[in-house]
Amino acid sequence: MLKTTIIGASGYTGAELAFMVNKHPQLTLSGLYVSANSVDAGKTIAQLHGKLANVVDMVVNALTDPKQVAQDSDVVFLATAHEVSHDLAPIFLEAGCQVFDLSGAFRVKSDGFYDTFYGFEHQFNNWLDKAAYGLAEWNQEEIKNAPLVAVAGCYPTASQLAIKPLLVDGLLDTQQWPVINATSGVSGAGRKASMTNSFCEVSLQPYGVFNHRHQPEIAQHLGCDVIFTPHLGNFKRGILATVTMKLAQGVTEQQVAQAFEQAYQGKPAVRLKGDGIPRIQDVENTPFCDIGWKVQGEHIIVISAIDNLLKGASSQAMQCLNIHYGYPELTALL
């Protein structure tokens, strides 16, 4: 049994991870932690997340000595803020822990990226170079071998899963950049209260127009520029991404279908709907990404739907763990 620790356990993604670790036949939950000054320290996770009552009743402790925690852990999930993951990951890695980081701290290898989009200067280029990008369906060999897996972001997961099969097979005219319009539920903003995610203030609206940090993450890992506009929706969880692209000359609907089928054959977390239209309610509280598409002339619209807290975060992190250790991909996820 792998001793598994969750840092940032009080948040939505941390709670989802606690449920999965408890359910996993090869993992044992060795500790739940929050920052030293968190008001949640000392409470049980079931007090913070009622759905875990009589499931996981472990106390959430303040993280005061990460080196000691590392000695008691085989696996560490970091469900923490970007700058916190940046500082903590090397401590656990140097102690020999396998680390799965749900933040953006190790996702993008690009000069100046973290200064520009995350507001801090990256100090650990050696670990940045060693990190595998945790887009589970596309980077399995890297995930199997890396000591650090930087789990893909929520919007980047929904977007890339919709685009990559066509891009890899050379079916797109990339002179016209893919245009991604994606809407996320309010849980994507986290558990901490703010005016932005207040019940009475939430209204469907775009944000981060032309400057959202997920645009360069998507573009770098696709190897293709994109126009990405995120939207905040007035619902709790889920992401729906609608991607408009131009097909290369002469590409047929049959080639499109074949590209998706070949890309995701044997990939149990992706469900292809063909010309059916994905819906958030079909993926909510599941580890799946549903993908559908429509072709008209030289253009294609691909729609993908995920649960932002699961396939966009916690279940993808667990899927990466399963890939890394050779367990069935959906172990503890269904």
UniProtKB/Swiss-Prot annotation:
| First-listed, main subcellular location of the protein, grouped into a coarse class | cytoplasm
State the UniProt keywords alphabetically.
Amino-acid biosynthesis, Arginine biosynthesis, Cytoplasm, NADP, Oxidoreductase
User: Pfam families, alphabetically?
Assistant: Semialdhyde_dh, Semialdhyde_dhC_1
* Top-rank lineage group of the source organism: Bacteria
The biological processes this protein is annotated with in GO are:
L-arginine biosynthetic process
Question: Which InterPro entries does the record associate with it?
Answer: AGPR_AS, AGPR_type-1, NAD(P)-bd_dom_sf, NAGSA_dehydrogenase, Semialdehyde_DH_NAD-bd
Where's it found, cell-wise?
A: Cytoplasm
- Metabolic or biological pathway: Amino-acid biosynthesis; L-arginine biosynthesis; N(2)-acetyl-L-ornithine from L-glutamate: step 3/4
GO CC annotation: cytoplasm
The record ties this protein, via SMART domains, to: Semialdhyde_dh (SM00859)
UniProt keyword annotation of Oxidoreductase present? yes
Q: Where is the active site?
A: 154
Family affiliation:
Belongs to the NAGSA dehydrogenase family. Type 1 subfamily.
Q: What does this protein do?
A: Catalyzes the NADPH-dependent reduction of N-acetyl-5-glutamyl phosphate to yield N-acetyl-L-glutamate 5-semialdehyde.
This protein is called what?
A: N-acetyl-gamma-glutamyl-phosphate reductase
Q: Which gene encodes it?
A: argC
